[in-house]
Amino acid sequence: MGLLTGKTALITGAARGIGKAIALKFASEGANVAFTDLFIDEEHGGLATEREIAALGVKAKGYASNAADFAQTADVVAKVKEEFGSVDILVNNAGITKDGLMLRMTEQQWDAVIAVNLKSAFNFIHACVPVMMRQCKGSIINMASVVGVHGNAGQSNYAASKAGLIALAKSVAQEMGPKGIRANAIAPGFIDTAMTQALSEEVRKEWASKIPLRRGGTTEDIANTALYLASDLSSYVSGQVIQVDGGMNM
């Protein structure tokens, strides 16, 4: 029996990348998986991800949704509850970057990143918590970043959104703990994804030189951490931030 057998996980921004890795990991441990992305089609990978999850013998469905839209989020969560029966695990993974130095950053760049990265998490937590309260149990995982812990020049919007996700997880942990709901955050470091693969080899080597393990992490590293926080292995863990960064930040 898998660690998540009989549970339903809802993961945002999971058509590819870290979100997809988490979805597949959860499914391999027996969870039924509902996931969202801006598009669920062949072009953007959503339908392929849905098929890969289902091939592991669990129920899987992708929902096209703008996670930053409060009304759309409420509608998605209602559909997941109706079609899956419960929401036991919520992973707030949806995120974007629109980098720029402070004096060159536009209001649109700031607002877009805060909306997708931070407001979306509020939207989904707000919609899922009533379901979890009725179940007297639930695990909420916010995908933050080491940038949210230490900041990063040229990423003030992204850093602020990720720091907000950490504070949001801690606040929800305090507020919802008496209801049996746990909330934690994962702060990945330099992870090998399509986003980081687009960087030059020189930049990638410079990053690796700053990491004690001398390499970037993998999406599997993050998925394994998410599995721990989603499962009963972490039943007494709440309000925490786990940095998965190869020792980059100590």
Name these PLM-found stretches.
Residues 2-84, 98, 108-109:
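Short-chain dehydrogenase/reductase
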Residues 101-102, 109-114, 196, 207:
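Substrate-binding pocket helix/loop in short-chain dehydrogenase/reductase
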Residues 145:
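Residue(s) in the substrate-gating loop at a strand-loop-helix junction
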Residues 103, 150-156, 178-179, 214, ...:
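Active-site loop immediately N-terminal to the catalytic Tyr-X3-Lys motif
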Residues 130, 174-178, 235:
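Alpha-helical segment proximal to the catalytic Tyr-Lys
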